[in-house]
A protein has these predicted regions:
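N-terminal alpha-helical transmembrane segments of multi-pass membrane transport
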Residues: 1-81, 91-98, 109, 432, ...
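Selective recognition of specific alpha-helical transmembrane segments in multi-pass small-molecule
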Residues: 108-116, 199-214, 225-245, 283, ...
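Flexible loop linkers connecting adjacent transmembrane helices
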Residues: 41-67, 89-91, 95-99, 103, ...
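Helix-loop-helix module between adjacent transmembrane segments
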Residues: 31-36, 105-130, 137, 141-175, ...
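Alpha-helical membrane segments and immediately flanking helix-loop junctions
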Residues: 60-93, 119-143, 156-162, 270-319
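Membrane-interface loop-to-helix entry segments
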Residues: 27-34, 41-51, 174-181, 194-255, ...
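Extracellular/periplasmic helix-exit of transmembrane alpha-helices
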Residues: 116-124, 128, 237-253, 264-268, ...
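C-terminal membrane-solvent junction of multi-pass transporters and transport-like membrane proteins
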Residues: 145-153, 389-433, 467-500
Length: 500
């Protein structure tokens, strides 16, 4: 039995490496570039998007939650450990140049986030209880001319989303949370705290919110996410300020290494331009989730006059997540390395090892990135350890809340509203399991599902790109953003049966 589990795990590792390889990267990057062109470089509308995200709701528009609530719920799932550890891992494996490519993918990813949200809003439906439902599965089913293919891709997308929510959205996050608590030097006797006790507390805290549904989750995220993001950015800016003399050198280093492939600080190690590209694209693409189709699942519930308004609001999430927060994280890390020769020496030695891509595993590289981020944050006197613990607690908790709603929408599509309560119970079990141990196998399985979400979602965006381009021109470029979309939103299914 043990041999079977080892073989199965090895097979899962191989599949994980394949699906997160260059094929997926080029699919996502190609979609980003294509939709940037099709939408007339929608990125230039970021100021409008930010303004809309904090505007008051139209009392006559249809929807369940505010535009800001939908945005913060999506950000709750994306602003997380990836912004700390993910950027550090990209730096560790691809050199400082990876940060430049990470930032660039965020800029172009804005167009894909806009596009996937637009079709989610355009093809959204209501269930028998009047609850708004949307996402790639409804766009695939309602928007495709070939109904059979559309239905198949829709079911696959929903299935992969549900599976991913149990791993990346639940057990992986709770495992990180429990680890942060038990290893914290701020809590006396932290290492002696039973993980099952932490599991019970965390599970109850998550249950209190998600049992209340999307409205309860969005209300919590509206309060938690802005505070969480501001706190983290402020701490990064403090470190950058402490190393202010190295800020210009850090910017020059990042840009230079992006096109030369130099990886080591003052050394001869060269990761190569392709590694800088690879890890920059990977960490950027998967930090903001543009192209995965996750955020539109919640965005479809927003109160909005027309599809373009909420699509603009959603794309501002990618701007904040990758273009702003990941960039600030990168500058914090690079200035810290330039200011601390001893830390840079450790980084250089790690780079020598990480040039052997065989160690690019969920444990090895992830741990290396975490160690690098930890070392940089500890440069803040007294507050350093507190920043890490509080930040990680907030990030992991909010991620669990956000992903619970993604899975909720996927299960509703597959099984109807009757599947929601059983799903929530299973989700909470995975939260508890993550606290007491979890496992790398769960990470890899959910990682694969997370990656496979992108395939049907990108197909939907590309096939329906004409609809997106036409709608963008009508609502945005012809000045109709304040007008109401009078197209009736269909009601599907019944209370006890699937909505498809």
């Amino acid at each position: 039995m043990e041999a079977f589990i080892e073989s199965f795990s090895a097979g899962v590792d191989a599949v994980d490496g394949f699906v997160w390889g260059w094929a997926l990267i080029w699919l996502l990057l190609g979609t980003h570039l294509f939709m940037t062109i099709r939408t007339g470089f929608i990125q230039r509308k970021i100021p409008t998007a930010i303004k809309l995200s904090v505007s008051k709701n139209d009392p006559y528009a249809e929807g369940d939650i505010s535009q800001f609530g939908a945005l913060t719920t999506a950000l709750a799932a994306t602003i997380g450990t990836g912004n700390i550890v993910g950027v550090a891992t990209g730096l560790l494996c691809g050199g400082p140049g990876a940060i430049f490519w990470m930032w660039l993918t965020g800029v172009f990813g804005i167009a894909t986030k806009y596009s996937e949200t637009y079709i989610s809003m355009k093809y959204r439906v209501k269930d028998a209880n009047g609850r708004m439902l949307g996402g790639a599965m409804y766009a695939l089913e309602r928007g495709f001319k070939h109904k059979g293919l559309g239905k198949l891709l829709a079911v696959l997308f929903a299935l992969f989303t549900a599976i991913a929510s149990f791993g990346i959205g639940a057990s992986v996050q709770s495992n990180s949370l429990a680890g942060a608590l038990t290893s914290s030097s701020l809590v006396p006797g932290a290492s002696e705290i039973p993980t099952w006790l932490i599991g019970i507390v965390v599970t109850v805290l998550v249950a209190i919110v998600i049992i209340g549904g999307l409205k309860k989750v969005s209300k919590v995220c509206e309060k938690l996410v802005p505070v969480m993001a501001i706190f983290y950015v402020a701490c990064c800016l403090v470190i950058i300020g402490m190393n202010g003399a190295y800020l210009w050198d850090a910017i020059v280093t990042i840009i230079t290494c992006a096109f030369t492939g130099q990886a080591a600080f003052g050394g001869a190690v060269g990761s190569g331009i392709m590694l800088a590209l690879q890890y920059g694209f990977k960490r950027g693409l998967f930090s903001n989730e543009s192209g995965l189709g996750s955020a539109p699942l919640v965005a479809a519930s927003a109160i909005s006059k027309n599809p373009a308004r909420q699509a603009l609001v959603s794309m501002s999430g990618t701007f904040w997540d990758t273009v702003v927060i990941c960039l600030i994280t990168g500058l914090m890390l690079v200035t810290s390395l330039l200011a601390n020769p001893d830390l840079a020496a450790i980084y250089n030695n790690t780079m020598l090892a990480s040039n052997d891509l065989s160690i690019d595993t969920a444990v090895g590289i992830f741990s290396g990135g975490a160690a690098l981020a930890t070392a940089c944050f500890e440069s803040i006197p007294v507050l350093g350890p507190l920043v890490l613990v509080v930040g990680l607690l907030c990030f992991t908790y909010s991620t669990m809340l956000g992903w619970s709603q993604y899975g909720d929408r996927a299960i509703t599509y597959l099984f109807g509203t009757k599947g929601i309560r059983p799903y929530q119970v299973v989700f909470l079990l995975f939260v508890f399991w993550g606290c007491i141990g979890g496992g790398d196998l769960v990470w890899n399985l959910s990682d694969i599902s997370n990656a496979l979400m992108a395939v049907p979602n990108c197909i939907a965006v590309l096939v329906l790109s004409g609809v997106i381009a036409k709608g963008t021109k009508y609502w945005i470029y012809e000045g109709r953003l304040e007008e109401e979309d009078t197209t009736p939103i269909p009601t599907v299914g019944t209370v006890d049966h699937p909505n498809v």
